[in-house]
Amino acid sequence: MNLLPKSSKEFGSADYWEKFFQQRGKTAFEWYGTYLELCEVLHKYIKPKEKVLVIGCGNSELSEQLYDVGYQDIVNIDISEVVIKQMKERNGSRRPHMSFLKMDMTQLEFPDATFQVVLDKGTLDAVLTDEEEVTLRQVDRMLAEVGRVLQVGGRYLCISLAQAHILKKAVGHFSREGWMVRAHQVASSQDRVSEAEPRFSLPVFAFVMTKFRPVPGSALQIFELCTQEQGKPVRLESADQLAEAVRERQYYAWLCSQLRRKAGLGSVSLDLCSGDTGEPRYTLHVVDNPAVKPSRDNHFAIFIIPQGRETEWLFGMEEGRKQLAASAGFRRLVTVALHRGQRYAGMESIQAELSARVMELAPAGLPPQQQVPFLSVGGDIGVRTVQHQDHSALSGDYVIEDVQGEDRWYFRRLIFLSNRNVVQSEARLLKDTSHRAQKKRKKDRKKQRPADTSEDFPPAPGQSIDKSYLCCEHHKAMVAGLALLRNPELLLETPLTLLVVGLGGGSLPLFVHDHFPKSRIDAVEIDPTMLEVATQWFGFSQSDRMKVHIADGLDYITSLAGEAPPHYDVIMFDVDSKDPTLGMSCPPPAFVDQVFLQKVKSILCHDGVFILNLVCRDVRLKDSVLAGLKAAFPLLYVRRIEGEVNEILFCQLHPEQKLATPELLEMAQVLERTLRKPGQGWDDTYVLSDMLKTVKIV
């Protein structure tokens, strides 16, 4: 039996409702929430002694339940004669002070200012079925009548699904009249709607419109929102902001209902924001792993990503999170990233804060009272220390932060806040041994540290950078590409000339400068702020062999191309694009334009190598870039960085320079033996030949 309208127009039809109640008989229809779901907001805004008008009462038990807890001055009206007769028969003797009248709410038969409260549970939604002129005129009459029969200080309580056209009409009407508008999301309504009434997947809202005395010339408008978790209302600036807040909650309710019904929705992510500031506090990703055979204990888990590690491939990329979910062995894993600028007391505090929210993302089939585990790496939430935050005219807002990585090492990172999930530059910090001596003197203390507390102190702002360590895999590959130069065993004594376009934190040119003592490096950086950052925070410094030119790399190379002879043994491009819409984030397209590549070619020495960091997600665009490079540089190697989008391209001028893989690996080994000299720091995990094992010729 189809008891819900086949089309929205039927909502406004008296004939439809007559047929509806005849079919349903005496069974109450609580499609906008039961009394238990609505009582909190109703009791907040209705006093027991106030006179209440319920418009479009239907056969809902709401009025009866209000009456039974002390709200006895209630008048109910409806356009259906059938339902009014039913309700009179049901309540005549049991609730003698409550009345039921057949009445058109657009023509109320009450004097002005008769009621303190007008209660509407779904009636406005039933009338405002579309935005045609006839419908809007009818709604205008209805809302005008509501305003007429309410006293000053009275409230219109409208229980609604808050569809966009209804929200626009009701909020617009009463805010123009100078009334205060407050919205409450009704607790648990999204759960009831998604499971019991699958056609209605929207959460239920209670709008409280409070009638103020008109003030001539005043344009004051008050909009507030109360969520189900938060009693304190949040003041909003406009009706549009209120509508947007409602839409966000509707989308969240829809998302939760979809996640409850089925798995494999694809990439699902959402931010949970602070109720006090509105700033993002947690970012959640839902990862389904249908390959896992279900058991009682493997349905659902939450993984807290340690602070500062959210940019790692395992946590920051979709494929990485899938691998994490598979290794964890749960059918659904929700990863939780913590935001910089937010304070977290510890793992237990985070669990308490998230418990209710994350359970709304649980999959179907989760056993009742099932304990959901919270997982992490090392059992703690990690360490993140923001050392500096500022603004660059070219790059926007940025932050310098120190984070704790694996094996208790700390890393300093530069992050542009326009792309928070990408580490722009990174360097490892040297461990500060002064603290260790201090701890040794205190070793006899009886009180021990908790097991999950870091034994290394957070780094100080001026702590030294480990210049021998390259954090970025693409930088390691770019340096390994120097093995393509002739006679690698002699490179330390060769006066190499290098051009590096894109400074960032300066780690790449600094490493080359320190390990190739005869090298001379020109670094080109368009943003002067980046030179300040590199110098102050990443241990970078200029010298007679290291010069930084504040210029556009395009202009700098164009100016050199007009000169002769060729200038550089090595040219490196490690420059990012500021336009995220292009499908290629490194380099900007102009740097791989055919005309410009000819200029690059003209300043590269005969046996030199041009090394390019390419980050391109658009397959067609990448193929076009590779074709253009191949046209300019006949010999082209490519090395993909595992777990990243980066591809390092090694370009040379002459096909006869081509090396087979065994030869290339041998030259890399020769170069590494040359670089590993006494007194010169070297990262033992950095093996040059490993960087070139997967190199392919295009």
Swiss-Prot record:
Q: What does this protein do?
A: Dual methyltransferase that catalyzes methylation of elongation factor 1-alpha (EEF1A1 and EEF1A2) at two different positions, and is therefore involved in the regulation of mRNA translation. Via its C-terminus, methylates EEF1A1 and EEF1A2 at the N-terminal residue 'Gly-2'. Via its N-terminus dimethylates EEF1A1 and EEF1A2 at residue 'Lys-55'. Has no activity towards core histones H2A, H2B, H3 and H4.
Q: What is its main location?
A: cytoplasm
Q: Mind telling me which GO cellular component terms the entry cites?
A: cytoplasm; cytosol; mitochondrion; nucleus
Please identify the protein, giving its name as recorded. Answer: eEF1A lysine and N-terminal methyltransferase
Tell me the domain of life. Eukaryota
Q: Which organism is it from?
A: Mus musculus (Mouse)
Keyword terms, alphabetized? Acetylation, Cytoplasm, Methyltransferase, Mitochondrion, Multifunctional enzyme, Nucleus, Phosphoprotein, Transferase
Q: Which GO terms describe its molecular function?
A: protein-lysine N-methyltransferase activity
What residues bear N-acetylmethionine in this entry? Answer: M1
How does this polypeptide assemble, per the annotation? Forms a tripartite complex containing GAB1, METTL13 and SPRY2. Within the complex interacts with GAB1 and SPRY2.
